[in-house]
Amino acid sequence: MVVVLTIPAWGQADSAVERFYKGNQVRLIGSAGPGSGYSAWTRFIGQYLGRHLPGEPAVVVQYMAGAGGLIAANYMYSLAGRDGREIASLAREAPALSLMHAPGVRYDSLKLNWLGTPTSESNICVVGRNAPIKTLDDLYGKETVVGTDGIGSGMHMFPVALNALVHTKFKVIDGYSDSGVVLLAIDRGEIHGACQSAETLLHARGDAIRSGDLRVVLQGGMRPNPKFPGVPFVLDLARNEEQRLALRFLYSSQTFGRPYVAPPEVPPERVAALRQAFTDMFRDKDFLADAARQDYDVNPISGDDMTTLIGELAKTPKPIIDEVAALIAPPSPR
């Protein structure tokens, strides 16, 4: 008697993926400077991801900062290897910037392989204790000088859009190397404040926020953040449905938190393995305990769900997308 053993296709794929990654290195690219909240998360992810990938490859973190994350996003789309050994942390605004065909964008967010995000977030605008901005009304009546880490980042996009849509008076100063340097500029009194990830600010300057050295004057996202009761919520500032839809599209990027991607054209079985590794890592008790010790909120979204959400975002009416794109576009050279 001859016994034929049939190995399921998924088993063969798992074995092939393990053979590929075993003894290899995975390059994890950080798209922001080393002092930023993105990079803190990237280093943290780099400590745990390899143990959840088949073959347990070493994960090496390298930085490719600049232009609010666009340099890394463009690299991942056009130049990164397609074998699954290069992945990256991108700016949460990356999907929206692609859909808006923003200046400097040379990637298609619908073709990138989204792997997951450890957290969904909100954006808050903060000012230093001595800034002349005390209330929401002051944002309309007084110039508020805010710093950013580049025109491709939310630190730039949100105040610019708010100026156009609801007539705040933010003066935006671009060109700081990363969000950590922006915070130092607030400390030195060079600028009044910044509009930045709530998680980043709570992690880096939670004591200052609690003491009032940094004051939260506005919050934005898909819903109010319960950590900031009584702070004005950006969607409530909309004066009509068109403004509300535009603000909702712009702030939808907060949902993506700290997104991780692989390039297009990576073999599907390796994309699946990378996505599963992120999902397993987000459930890892050691990972969760370590995150809690460092005051990181873990509220993950899977790569599959991110892909679905970005597809839904792409269905936003084109006039709304075009309006938001026009709001955040840099001025034409004279």
Model regions: which residues?
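Bacterial N-terminal signal peptides
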Residues: 1-8
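Generic detection of intrinsically disordered/low-complexity segments and helix-coil linkers/edges
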Residues: 4, 14-15, 243, 281, ...
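Cleavable N-terminal signal peptides
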Residues: 9-13
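Conserved hydrophobic/amphipathic secondary-structure segments
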Residues: 14, 18-257, 329-333
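An extracytoplasmic/periplasmic, membrane-proximal ligand-sensing/linker region
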Residues: 22-24, 212, 217, 266-334
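Structural beta->alpha junctions
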Residues: 33-34, 263-268
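A conserved hydrophobic position in a structured secondary element of the catalytic/binding core
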Residues: 127, 229, 262, 282-283
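A short beta-strand structural signal in non-transmembrane regions
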Residues: 257-263
